[in-house]
Amino acid sequence: MKKRFFTAWVLLILVAVSAWSQQAKYVFYFIGDGMGVNQVNGTEAYRAELEGRIGITPLLFTQFPFATMATTYSANSKITDSAAAGTALATGYKTKNSTLGLLPDLKTEVSSIAVKAQKAGARVGIATSVSIDHATPAAFYAHVPSRDSRYEIGKQLISAGFDFYAGSDFDRPTNRKAPEEGTLYEQSEKAGYTIVRGYKEYQKKARKADKIILFQSEEASKRDRGSIPYSIDREKGDLSLTEITRAGINFLSKDLSKGFFLMVEGGKIDYACHANDAATTFAEVEDFDNAIRVAYEFYEQHPDETLIVVTADHETGGIVLGTGKYDQNLQALKYQRMSVNKLSDKLNELRKKTDNKVTWEMAQQLLGEHFGLGNPLKLNKRQEERLRKAYDENFKDQEAAYDESMYQKDERLATVAKEIINEIAMVGWMSGSHSNGYVPVFSIGAGAEKFCHRADNTDLPKKIAEAAGWE
């Protein structure tokens, strides 16, 4: 009897060890740009308030079985930028701010986990909600001293030869100094890439494509080639991060025997945080979670061979959930129906429509309709005076007053409206830039247990390589 029990116990251990040590064949690496701990916590608390209760309503990825946090400092600064952080997350090496794929000497190239996957025979995809040559996606294929070398980064994207790319567009598709080289679109097609615009065109052309680049529509790029629209502003036909993720999985799954690596960046979380736009930030985090859900559905079909890792490159804005009182009113943000940038556009449209003869009553109506200010959100005297002063600055002269953040320029009245709804919601911001806060790390699947101790951002690609056998 004892012998049988011992044999059964040994078999149980062997089965457990076998499951525990299963290599990851399909790897998802989700990076929420600017998504610190409070961006995640704030989103979940906001969701709970919308349900009329105190607490949190969890996102999908925060329910993954393994969770930890990571440090983010760069080689030359306590506060990283996205290039240095992206390089750390992609290669496992620290570098200087603004640098991509190079050591701090700005000469020595370091390979990313995506390149290691490619060399191991896996199919590779790099995707983002901003331009495909932006810092985070570029860290997986480019080697340049300056993240601003967008055209050169685009050329290196092509030479990297990954199977799938997706983003809003190329930020700088031409080289004015060498027009004979042709555009990056032409160079991509010459290298064997099929370029598609929008998810519907992807569905039509993906099956016959050997390698593919998915961009938003040309019309959308004319409005803003630097990113797809915020989820809170999304209209019918706009490309979404969920569609991008679904396309990536679909394309890389053409030959599942090879396995794959797919990095997906939620790039517009960072944009919203730079603008200190709480409602838009929480909407972007939730949209990021929706994209992760698509990968999770794949995981459910291949649980023993799939690894999903979710993290961030840094925190942006120094968001504070509480501004003095022992309370919050996050539910007020539900009345903000568009980003501050979109509200700025609405004000500009009103100016053009009225030949700059916008009355205070017209402005009030717009603020109430799109931000709920005045109705249903009651304003105190100081808040009303701030809005009226911003209105005067905006419409008394022919030239409107603007406020600039990292990625957008907003009319003063829109900026003040955003500040007031943040105030009503009791959300504070310390800056319009990055901070040195920890970033969260969540994981599930084959090798996920490797991500259960406090880490540095350089540890993550090393652990992924170990889990997948791509060392």
Where are each of the predicted segments found?
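A post-motif C-terminal structural segment
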Residues: K25-Y26, M35-N41, A45-T87, H134-E471
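Bacterial N-terminal signal peptides
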Residues: A8-S18
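Bacterial N-terminal signal peptides that target proteins for export
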Residues: M1-W9
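Extracytoplasmic mature domains of secreted/periplasmic and thylakoid-lumen proteins
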Residues: Y93-F162, D169
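Boundary at the C-terminal end of the N-terminal hydrophobic targeting segment
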Residues: A19-Q23
